[in-house]
Amino acid sequence: MRVYSCHFCSSPVYPLHGIMFVRNDAKEFRFCRSKCHHAFKQRRNPRKLRWTKAFRKAAGKELVVDSTLTFAARRNVPVRYNRDLVATTLKTMARVEEIRQKRERAFYKNRMRGNKDKKLALDRRLVEQNPQLLKIRDVELRRKAERKAAKENAMDEEIEDEEEEIASEDMMSEDEEMESESEAESTKQKVVLKNKKKSKRSN
């Protein structure tokens, strides 16, 4: 499967995808989507648009000079088919890709190394130039503390209500037990009285 690269943004163009424009001199231009085709027709410069690979390479955001990138160059030299050569080539391609990814990660980490300190310096300068921001921050913190305190109070009230409900339920259960005991005693007394009356009548 032959995978071409977009003439404008350098994205991969897979078979049955993209747009191809053939100029009068038989030069082919392949585009990954209509956005790139439209920009090409408008004669836009890819180095001036931030979403293209050309801009990222020109701005130093991507790895440009590296030995692993030379393996991707096209070589129009016919080579006689050899099974062992194909196997070793495939293994080498996988290894080269792994090395390239490692170097790209290292390049990115090296490029992003001083960003944290720069951001802190910018924030410090912003606060020094606009001291009213600290007051706004104090107000926000105070409101946050008030909301937290209100939430805790509401939770405490809910817990107290639950405890009161449990206590009232316990009291009601105790009253019911007392009533049931008193009813049982009264029934016992009635049975005893009936037995006494029966014994008197029999006498």
From Swiss-Prot:
Main localization category: cytoplasm
Swiss-Prot/TrEMBL keywords: Cytoplasm, Nucleus, Ribosome biogenesis
One Gene Ontology cellular component annotation held by this UniProt entry: preribosome, large subunit precursor
Taxonomy, superkingdom: Eukaryota
Any one Gene Ontology BP term: assembly of large subunit precursor of preribosome
SMART domains in the cross-refs: TRASH (SM00746)
GO molecular function, one term: structural constituent of ribosome
Compositional bias ranges of the Basic residues kind: 191-203
Acidic residues: compositionally biased ranges: 155-184
Region (Disordered): 147-203
Compartment(s) of residence: Cytoplasm; Nucleus
PANTHER family: 60S RIBOSOMAL PROTEIN L24, RIBOSOME BIOGENESIS PROTEIN RLP24-RELATED
Subunit comment: Associated with nucleolar and cytoplasmic pre-60S particles. At the end of biogenesis it dissociates from cytoplasmic pre-60S particles and is likely to be exchanged for its ribosomal homolog, RPL24.
Protein family (similarity comment): Belongs to the eukaryotic ribosomal protein eL24 family.
Job description of the protein: Involved in the biogenesis of the 60S ribosomal subunit. Ensures the docking of DEHA2D15950g/NOG1 to pre-60S particles. Activates and recruits ATPase AFG2 to cytoplasmic pre-60S ribosomal particles.
Protein name: Ribosome biogenesis protein RLP24
